[in-house]
């Protein structure tokens, strides 16, 4: 909980949680730019305030989400099959977040910063296919000159 400043609406990304040999291990982020601050939207701050208020003795050392991605695998698989939709991985939510940001016109540089990518080439190489083809827009713009 200490990595979230609800008053300032900021999440400080300073570490990474890895699962190694059935143990949770906290490590530094993979890259220098992996250490970053993420500004949180109002709706998420409200959700976090509500969630944290339900945790007994929540303090700066409290790990807010004790669940592991491994423990989500089987329920996700089961309910995806019931709903007859493709199963998504937790990491796919990150991909969806980027797709939404692109759709809303957020610049690739801002997205790279938010994701903690050291180089914009990583962002564009991974998510470049999500950018809409703007050739018609460009031609129309040039027609106005």
Kindly label every feature range from the protein language model.
Residues 18, 22-28, 125-145:
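DNA/chromatin major-groove-contacting recognition/catalytic segments
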Residues 1-4, 112-118, 128:
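A short, basic/aromatic helix-end/turn motif that makes direct DNA contacts
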Residues 8, 52, 124, 139:
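Short, flexible helix/strand-to-coil boundary loops that buttress conserved ligand/catalytic motifs
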Residues 31, 96, 122-126:
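Ser/Thr-centric signal marking residues that sit
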Residues 44, 72, 120-123, 138:
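Hydrophobic side chains within well-formed alpha-helices
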Residues 38, 52-67, 73-113, 117, ...:
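Short, basic (Lys/Arg/His-rich) helix/loop patches that form interaction surfaces
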Residues 1-50:
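Conserved tyrosine-mediated DNA breakage-rejoining catalytic core shared by Y-recombinases
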């Amino acid at each position: 909980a200490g990595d979230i400043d609800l008053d300032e609406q900021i999440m400080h990304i300073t570490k990474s949680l890895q699962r190694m040999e059935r143990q949770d291990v906290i490590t530094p982020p993979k890259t220098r730019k992996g250490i970053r601050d993420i500004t949180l939207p109002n709706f998420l701050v409200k959700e976090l305030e509500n969630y944290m208020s339900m945790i007994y003795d929540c303090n700066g050392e409290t790990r807010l989400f004790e669940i592991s991605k491994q423990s989500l695998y089987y329920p996700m698989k089961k309910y995806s099959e019931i709903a007859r939709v493709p199963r998504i991985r937790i990491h796919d939510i990150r991909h969806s977040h980027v797709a939404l940001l692109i759709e809303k016109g957020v610049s690739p540089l801002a997205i790279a910063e938010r994701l903690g990518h050291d180089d914009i080439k990583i962002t564009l190489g991974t998510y470049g296919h999500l950018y809409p083809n703007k050739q018609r827009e460009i031609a129309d713009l040039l027609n106005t000159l």
